[in-house]
Amino acid sequence: MSELLRNIDGRTKLAGTNKLEILMFTLGLDNRTGRCETFGINVFKVREVMRVPPITHAPEMPGSVEGMVSLRGVLVPVIDLAKYTGVQTDIKPGIMVVTEYNGHTQGFLVEAVDTILRLDWSAMRVPPDMLNAQMGGLVTAVTELPDGRLVMMMDVEKVLAETGHFNDDLALKAVKPLGISDRTVFFADDSAVARKQIVSALEAMQVNHLSAINGRKAWDELQRIANYAESAGLPVSDMVQVILTDVEMPEMDGYMLTRMIKEDKRFANIPVLMHSSLSSESNQQLGKAVGVDEYVPKFEPQKLSQTLARLLTKNRKD
């Protein structure tokens, strides 16, 4: 298992190349379907993989939260992904995948880990509507392996939001209206939970917004906007004042999207704000390397609104 994740820190050099590496895992044979589905998680978010340690159970926790474990003196919540996804299996999870999102550490119980797969984000597709409905919006991207198996990228942000890790209701109440009616933010994110949080923050600010569900669709839409502005003799910055992007997205990731935006002179005066749960300093530095202007962690709507307010008013023409 240590061999599987060896040099995981060095894998961050893939950022900006539209490539990623995913740790594949299974949740056990589902007695209802007779299938053992394969899921994936970006190795950027994996801290370690271990045998399941002793778990301290606590009352009044969501059904899929097994309890807490102590890792080097830090209490970490543990989520049983089979229970969360509704997989009915007789197999007891034997592996815990320790992950970090937005500075929060949690353990995910799985049946087994398979291998680490390197691929291009262009090989990751938006899940078909049927699969999306079947999985309750839990899958953000899918890819097919040479042996015909389907690997599904799990929307971990949705898991964490629904198991009580992120609750932004109170923070949203502190978001103030911008007081300017002619500002527009364009954002790209593949997570339905993240998109909902962004929209809530922007609506609280009373800011106009446009969006796309992945980097490729975002780039296509931004090109359409830029072409329209060019034909009308207007700067693109008259139509969009800030571009907000996630990092992990099927077809094109946020690093590649940012690089392409920065290489197109029509977007020269429009800041790119990276909005991601990849919270390590190394990932922030990688964003800066491709031209990201600012970084805001996900699920912190007050920080998001404050940063957007500053960027939206910075170069405003009165």
Where are the model-predicted features located?
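An acidic, low-aromatic, low-complexity terminal/linker signal
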Residues: M1-Q241, V247-M256, E263-A268, S277-A289, ...
